[in-house]
């Protein structure tokens, strides 16, 4: 998981309202709340999103 590579995300993972939270726009997202509160730097969230965007879409 990409999230595990971001140290400041680790304590927040598993605390989102939805188990399949993508940490993008979902209500109840612990990462977005931490971003709004200044506990996650905007540059780090931008890096996380950039990495996710560069990954291929999963095939089901």
UniProtKB/Swiss-Prot annotation:
Stated name of the protein: Uncharacterized protein in rhdA 5'region
Q: Which family does it belong to?
A: To E.coli YjeQ and H.influenzae HI_1714.
Question: Can you tell which superkingdom this protein's organism belongs to?
Answer: Bacteria
